[in-house]
């Protein structure tokens, strides 16, 4: 349906903003020609800023690949006004905020958010990046190592590898061809060999390119626009303006030599992918007409008659996406990516024939006004009823948009097609021709068939030319399937009215309970959007009873999603999302989006559960997909492996992936057919319904589900016995004990090692929670600074809190290519020893400042229904049911004394603490494997070496579960 537009005037120019947006906007231009968009939001708890600089990796000097990205790293270090190293990040982190940046081809974007009461100083520190940064020689060398570590992390990532291969196969004199991340070789070894000083080049690059007139700033504050403007004018007007012209890189990256090519590449992971791309007219020049969005909508559609539906029916594909890929003002690629099955890999030519058949269909049918109008209506509703998101996420895109779009479209960008122009769309359709395509085909089956290697990632590949006539042969060989345009979308909402809910509950209430289910209900009292959130957790004791059951339950949920895909895809396009996935004790159904037609989708999904049957052809495809996923576990980043082992050690009723992979090899369709009725035979459904839904509607939804599943003359489900209600249990580590688990990295080609150093502390308790959280806040930046910035152990360095079903702890996570896990573990202990004095000597003022920052973080309001619902659902699912958690913990924080934090640290965290319980997971990459034996010999006493994870877990006491503890009786 058409939605009333809402405009606001910005610097004398009208800007399109969402109808539901009550923020105020103002555009100003400083005397140095810096363009700034000010946003005032009195309701915000966090303030944020984003600076977009119109220079990126395309401007890297020859022989200094990655310099723009390296500069992005360096600006975080220090400035003349704030010379203490890393003080910017420290200040932001200690005041509840976060910092980040990215380098793109023609843009570098810096951004942060922080608690509102600390915004002034944070913004001033940020401004100094662009006024007088310090780039010391010592810091320069250390940060080159950080960039190198970041690159090491990417070397075995298929996404990074294929992207660089696509760039490699382009014109060498076009910047698209470049390697943009940088590494030790490009930023130190090669320049040094040529007598080039990287630091001098870094400063030169900064001075040449960082000019106020090609920067765009967005500042999001709580104060009035006038006050924010005053801040910005004081802080940012000293940025130098050297009147630079935004760099442009005309010309196409691909010549005839790089088109009509078939590239076969060998990926790291199992699976086959087919990517086809065409150089096309950049949509940015016609964003109101949205040619690539229109074509992506149709070629990427998954409903009946679509290309994907045909490929899925043939058993050849498991996924397909289409749309505009990399683009600038001068070039663009339209890309189609297809995930192939093993059978699909053997029918690549027919698949490409079907793709070109579908493109021919689009050429023959012409551009349809009703499809464009439908797409426009969906986009318009999405824009005007968009959820509020965290300020930093919101403004990053706006800052980038300011470079490209006229002022009126800064907020909307190209997300709102409004002008139907068949000629412009037809032009791009015609560009998707057999004469200018590029095919990238990835499979491990090409092992031994390649003769080339991409230089930066060493990806093995081969290349051959494919003529238009060959494509025509493939088109003729394609199977005869009925491809057609999608049907009109029945899920587009037409009722966007808000319910006048009688209940004004501020927390979920238990609305209904029966032997079959329990319904928690929370009406929308905050967001005023026509949306709802539904969560239904099917607790099935059989689901987690063995590795076999876990795999069978997984296959069941995937088959459900598979069967519903062509129907539910329309709902997804219209802004109504659903998913069926594994949960701790069974499987869960999630629905989120416009409430108008949500119940139709919910009842369809439940009907499919009730009438579930196994289709052998779809089972075979799903089994193949899941098998490859398990086989690819061994290619995960080492720190992900370490976190997995930590969970496997701690969480009861979890099974090793190797055992689940073994189950898959023997699984047949009839096993699933026999299992699902048994899985569902004993079930309890925990329900949460929130948003623009009245309480009687919520009750009616759940009653309908009970009628379908439990109250049939031959019910599919029966209620659980009281003894069957499942609980999540977590291993209780021994006080004063250290536990160690040493393991080879599962990918022999990966040089990176990883450590997770976990300290288990307590069972959910408000007063203990706040002490652990305060320790985490105070120690987080110190950890990052010491282990990453100073010691350069690795790009991935983090201190994070951990919550396993209400059992709280803290974990240090480090991945490194330069040091082994034993050494890293010793550095974590050293860090904790050094932290003692910092904590003991902390001034009362600093203590109060940290407490205030944590209080502000806790009082931060939920931005949208999804965020709020996830918070409450965690309480329901874990059984803690502390819906007042934030307020209670704030109350406890206000009473907290500094000595209590010190006592907590001394008792549970510090090295040698009497009640400390630590678990070190050490994963050894290929270059540190030889250190494992000596590391094992050197573990201190008293300690436990875990050899058999499941054997260890079964022999340990478990923490009590919150589920069933203090909950309302059924």
Swiss-Prot record:
InterPro entries: Metalloenz_LuxS/M16, Pept_M16_N, Pept_M16_Zn_BS, Peptidase_M16, Peptidase_M16_C, Peptidase_M16_M, PqqF-like_C_4. GO terms for molecular function: metal ion binding; metalloendopeptidase activity. Keywords: Hydrolase, Metal-binding, Metalloprotease, Peroxisome, Protease, Zinc. Its cofactor is Zn(2+). It is an enzyme of class 3 (hydrolase). Pfam families: Peptidase_M16, Peptidase_M16_C, Peptidase_M16_M, PqqF-like_C_4. Signal peptide: none annotated. Its EC number is 3.4.24.-. The active site is at residues 72, 143. Binds 1 zinc ion per subunit. The keyword Zinc applies. Disruption phenotype: No visible phenotype, and full processing of glyoxysomal precursor proteins. Zn(2+) binds at residues 69, 73, 150. It is found in: Peroxisome. GO terms for cellular component: cytosol; peroxisome. SUPFAM superfamilies: LuxS/MPP-like metallohydrolase. It comes from the Eukaryota. One of its GO terms (biological process) is proteolysis. Gene3D superfamilies: Metalloenzyme, LuxS/M16 peptidase-like. Peptidase that might be involved in pathogen or wound response. Not required for peroxisome biogenesis, indole-3-butyric acid (IBA) metabolism, fatty acid beta-oxidation or degradation of glyoxylate cycle enzymes during seedling development. Belongs to the peptidase M16 family. PANTHER family: INSULIN-DEGRADING ENZYME-RELATED (PTHR43690:SF18), NARDILYSIN (PTHR43690). This is Insulin-degrading enzyme-like 1, peroxisomal. It comes from Arabidopsis thaliana (Mouse-ear cress).
């Amino acid at each position: 349906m058409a939605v009333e537009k809402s405009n606001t005037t910005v610097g004398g120019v009208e800007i399109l903003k969402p109808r539901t947006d009550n923020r105020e906007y103002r555009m100003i231009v400083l005397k140095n020609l810096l363009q700034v968009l000010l946003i005032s939001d009195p309701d915000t708890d966090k303030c944020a800023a984003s600076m977009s600089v119109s220079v990126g990796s395309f401007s890297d000097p020859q022989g200094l690949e990655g310099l723009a990205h390296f500069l992005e790293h360096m600006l975080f270090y220090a400035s003349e006004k704030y010379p203490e190293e890393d003080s910017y990040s420290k200040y932001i982190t200690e005041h509840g905020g976060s910092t980040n940046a990215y380098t793109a081809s023609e843009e570098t974007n810096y951004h942060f958010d922080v608690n509102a009461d600390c915004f002034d100083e944070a913004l001033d520190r940020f401004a100094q990046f662009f006024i007088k940064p310090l780039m010391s020689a010592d810091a320069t060398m250390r940060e080159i190592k950080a960039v190198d570590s970041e690159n090491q992390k990417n070397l075995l990532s298929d996404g990074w590898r294929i992207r660089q291969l696509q760039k490699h196969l382009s014109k060498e004199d076009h910047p698209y061809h470049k390697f943009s991340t940088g590494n030790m070789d490009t930023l130190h070894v090669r320049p040094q060999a040529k007598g080039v000083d990287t630091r001098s080049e870094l400063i030169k690059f900064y001075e040449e390119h960082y000019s106020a007139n090609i920067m765009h700033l967005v500042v999001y504050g709580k104060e009035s626009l006038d006050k924010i403007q005053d801040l910005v004018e004081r802080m940012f007007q000293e940025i130098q303006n050297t009147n630079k012209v935004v760099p442009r890189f005309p010309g196409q990256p691909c010549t005839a030599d790089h088109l009509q090519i078939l590239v076969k590449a060998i990926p790291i992971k199992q699976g086959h992918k087919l990517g086809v791309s065409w150089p096309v007219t950049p949509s940015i020049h016609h964003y109101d007409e949205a040619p690539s969005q229109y074509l992506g909508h149709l070629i990427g559609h998954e409903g009946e008659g679509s290309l994907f539906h045909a490929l899925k029916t043939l058993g050849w594909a498991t996924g397909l996406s289409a749309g505009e890929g990399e683009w600038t003002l001068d070039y663009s690629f339209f890309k189609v990516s297809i995930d192939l099955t093993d059978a699909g890999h053997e029918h690549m030519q027919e698949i490409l024939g079907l793709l070109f058949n579908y493109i021919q269909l689009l050429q023959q049918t012409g551009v349809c006004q009703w499809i464009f109008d439908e797409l426009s209506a969906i986009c318009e509703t999405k824009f005007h009823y968009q959820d509020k998101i965290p300020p930093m996420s919101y403004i990053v895109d706006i800052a980038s948009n300011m470079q490209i779009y006229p002022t009126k479209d800064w907020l909307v960008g190209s997300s709102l097609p409004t002008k139907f122009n068949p000629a412009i769309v037809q032009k791009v359709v015609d560009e998707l021709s057999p004469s200018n395509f590029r095919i990238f085909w990835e499979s491990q089956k090409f092992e031994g068939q390649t003769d080339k290697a991409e230089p930066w990632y060493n990806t093995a590949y081969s290349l051959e030319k494919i003529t238009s006539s060959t494509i025509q042969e493939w088109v003729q060989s394609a199977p005869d399937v009925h491809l057609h345009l999608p049907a009109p979308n029945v899920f587009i909402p037409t009722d966007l009215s808000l319910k006048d809910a009688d209940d004004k509950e501020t927390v979920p209430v238990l609305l209904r309970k029966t032997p079959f289910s329990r319904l928690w209900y929370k009406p929308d009292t905050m967001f005023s959007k026509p949306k709802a959130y539904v969560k239904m957790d099917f607790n099935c004791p059989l689901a987690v009873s063995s590795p076999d059951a876990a795999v069978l339950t997984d296959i069941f949920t995937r088959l459900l999603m598979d069967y519903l895909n062509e129907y539910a895809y329309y709902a997804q396009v219209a802004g109504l999302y659903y998913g069926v996935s594994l949960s701790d004790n069974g499987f869960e159904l999630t629905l989120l989006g416009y409430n108008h037609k949500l119940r139709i989708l919910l009842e369809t999904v439940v009907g499919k559960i009730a009438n579930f049957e196994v289709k052998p052809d779809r089972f075979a495809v799903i089994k193949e997909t899941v098998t490859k996923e398990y086989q690819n576990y061994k290619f995960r980043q080492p720190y992900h492996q370490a976190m997995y082992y930590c969970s496997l050690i701690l969480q009861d009723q979890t099974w090793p992936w190797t055992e689940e992979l073994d189950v898959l090899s023997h699984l047949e369709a009839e096993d699933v057919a026999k299992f699902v009725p048994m899985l569902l035979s004993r079930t309890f459904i925990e329900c949460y319904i929130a948003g623009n839904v009245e309480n009687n509607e919520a009750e009616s939804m759940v009653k309908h589900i009970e009628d379908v599943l439990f109250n049939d003359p031959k019910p599919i489900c029966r209620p659980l016995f009281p003894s069957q209600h499942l609980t999540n249990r977590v291993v209780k580590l021994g006080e004063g004990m250290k536990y160690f688990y040493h393991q080879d990295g599962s990918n022999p080609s990966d040089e990176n090692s990883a450590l997770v150093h976990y300290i288990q502390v307590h069972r959910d308790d408000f007063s203990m929670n706040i002490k652990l959280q305060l320790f985490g806040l105070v120690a987080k930046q110190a950890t990052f600074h010491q282990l990453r910035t100073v010691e350069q152990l690795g790009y991935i360095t983090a201190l994070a809190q951990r919550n396993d079903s209400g059992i709280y702890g803290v974990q240090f996570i480090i991945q490194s290519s330069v040091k082994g896990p034993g050494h890293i573990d010793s550095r974590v202990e050293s860090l904790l020893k050094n932290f003692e004095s910092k904590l003991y000597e902390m001034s009362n003022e600093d203590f109060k400042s940290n407490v205030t920052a944590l209080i502000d973080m806790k009082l931060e309001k939920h931005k949208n229904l999804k965020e709020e619902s996830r918070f409450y659902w965690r309480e329901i699912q874990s059984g803690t049911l502390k819906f007042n958690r934030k307020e209670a913990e704030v109350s406890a924080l206000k009473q907290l004394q500094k000595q209590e934090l010190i006592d907590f640290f001394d008792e549970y965290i510090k090295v040698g603490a009497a009640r400390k319980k630590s678990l070190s997971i050490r994963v050894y990459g290929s270059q540190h494997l030889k250190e494992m034996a000596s590391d094992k010999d050197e573990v201190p006493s008293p300690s436990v070496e875990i050899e058999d994870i499941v054997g260890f877990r079964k022999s340990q006491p478990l923490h009590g579960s919150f589920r069933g503890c203090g909950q309302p009786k059924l």
